[in-house]
Amino acid sequence: MQEVQRLWDIRQEVRIKKPLVCNITNTVVTNFTANVLLAVGASPLMSEGWQEADDLAKIVDVLVLNMGTLHPRQVEYFIKAGKSANQEQKPVVFDPVGIGATSYRNAVAAEILDKIKLDLIRGNHGEINFLAGITGQTKGVDSLSNQISVKHLAEFANTTRTLVVSTGEVDYLSDGAKTFTNKTGHAYLQLVTGTGCALSSLAGAFMSVTEDKCLGVLSALAFYGAAAQKAALISQGPGTFAGNFLDALYGLEFDEFKKILEAPKI
């Protein structure tokens, strides 16, 4: 009960503090990501111009880098914005969308890992398997792997000195020393474009309002999945789910959150 309350308290802090989340993200998910952030009470900022990197780093609460639709100008902005955020001591989230699918994506991800101090890396099991040096399969930006090596996940988090989240049927979060699991969620999330990308931004919002960044990310995972489960109950398919999911993110109450987290997992 106490642990569930701590997770919920972070969700409430997002409503109170309304963190400003700067997203340098892909063109496919911009609208959905912004709506997810608005639904939970955060403030989304979607940016595409490297010229504003220094100014934005001073005012935002967290920076999210998403390489879903890569192009050279965006890569330049990734590096500039990441360095500016590091200088201002703002947390940086990296979503390595589609890594392992092309050599270009692999090279961009390597550059980001080399030049920017990251606070969180969030990807699906295939993407994190690849980053951790395990043979994982990706098809485009989708994962064909439904498993993650907890040992390698922890080693990767320890090596990079960052929080690492690998999402799938079960989500895993590691800080290098400890690894946590989250079992909330629903299969409909895999059928709506941008749900993974939006989760990366939501995790950034949650981690920005608490000193315990690991607990903040775990709260985001649990809350996001619980909202998905609530939305799925009244949805006929992915189309109705997308709208219901935004409503659930906005309206999920503590009693519902607690019930979902404490329900036995089959």
Swiss-Prot record:
Recorded superkingdom: Bacteria
EC number: 2.7.1.50
UniProt-listed InterPro entries: Hyethyz_kinase, Ribokinase-like
A GO MF term: hydroxyethylthiazole kinase activity
Cofactors named for this entry: Mg(2+)
Any single Pfam family the record assigns to this protein: HK
Catalytic function, reaction form: 5-(2-hydroxyethyl)-4-methylthiazole + ATP = 4-methyl-5-(2-phosphooxyethyl)-thiazole + ADP + H(+)
Binding site for substrate: 46, 194
Family: Belongs to the Thz kinase family.
The name this protein goes by in its record: Hydroxyethylthiazole kinase
